[in-house]
Every structure is written in structure tokens, then in C-alpha cells.
């Protein structure tokens, strides 16, 4: 009887350790897809309430020079995650029609969604969150990121460039 109880305890411990190991691995593997999308393990995550330029999208700076704003936006998000050694906590609120998790993602207490807006590398998307709206307005006023010149809002760019 003691042997059976001991075996069940060992099995329970092994199962717990396996699940913890899987969580650590999936949190360690983070891929920045573009300025508003991540892959964490097998999870596809879209940053909720923001819309960043598409990876192949171009914008125009203050001197009317064309630049790769989609790549710049992605690089900015990647830089923030790299500083945090890709340790990110994404809090899923819902799932979209493409089966991506719509989430607010954090590095510690720093909200990545909000930081992308503050830096000017994203626009508010279908959100009435006051902090998000203020951050976008401030970035626009300070001509940060995509607000330094002219750009097509990402949702319009996608409509014009459907495959």
C-alpha cells in the first residue's frame, strides 16, 4: 500500500515538473512577427487595441523620403523584448477570426501595447482606451515614429494590398 501511494506521488511530481518545463520553454521562445504581433511557442498573439504598419509597408519621413516603417516598427518592439531577454507576459482577452489571441502584453509593469503607441510605431485600433488615445495623440504631436511624416493607416494598407 505504501509502495502504491509513493508511486502515485512520484507520478504526480513528474507530471507537475513536465508542465512547468513546458511553460518555461514556451515563454522563452518569443518571435516578433511585426509591430503588433508575436509568437510565443505555438501561441499567435496580436497586441490588442493597436495597429502597427505591416512588415513590408513603406512610409514617408519629414523630408518626404520613403522608408520601411513596417520593419522599423517591428525592430522597435523586438528591441524592447530583447532588453527584457524576451520575458513577456501576455494577458489574452479574446481570440480573433484568425485564431490569434488578442492580448495586452507586459514586460514587468510596462505595457508593450501602450509603449508602441507612445513611440509612434502604432496607431490606436478599435479601442476607446483613454491611455491609448492620449499616447497616440502625444506621439503625433511630437512627430514620433510614423507620425514624423506621411503614412497610410495599416488597416487601409491591408485593404489595398490583399493577395
Model-derived features: positions:
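Small beta-barrel nucleic-acid-binding modules, primarily SNase/OB-fold domains
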Residues: 2-163
Amino acid at each position: 500500500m505504501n509502495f502504491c501511494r509513493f508511486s502515485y506521488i512520484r507520478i504526480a511530481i513528474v507530471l507537475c515538473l513536465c508542465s512547468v518545463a513546458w511553460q518555461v520553454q514556451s515563454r522563452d521562445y518569443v518571435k516578433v512577427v511585426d509591430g503588433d504581433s508575436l509568437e510565443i511557442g505555438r501561441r499567435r498573439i496580436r497586441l490588442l487595441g493597436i495597429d502597427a504598419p505591416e512588415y513590408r509597408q513603406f512610409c514617408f519621413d519629414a523630408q518626404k523620403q520613403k522608408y520601411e516603417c513596417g520593419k522599423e516598427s517591428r525592430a522597435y518592439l523586438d528591441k524592447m523584448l530583447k532588453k527584457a531577454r524576451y520575458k513577456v507576459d501576455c494577458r489574452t482577452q479574446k481570440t480573433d477570426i484568425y485564431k490569434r489571441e488578442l492580448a495586452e502584453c507586459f514586460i514587468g509593469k510596462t505595457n508593450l501595447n501602450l509603449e508602441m503607441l507612445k513611440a509612434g510605431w502604432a496607431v490606436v485600433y478599435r479601442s476607446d482606451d483613454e491611455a491609448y488615445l492620449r499616447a497616440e495623440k502625444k506621439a503625433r504631436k511630437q512627430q514620433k515614429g510614423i507620425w514624423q511624416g506621411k503614412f497610410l493607416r495599416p488597416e487601409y494598407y491591408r485593404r489595398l494590398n490583399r493577395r
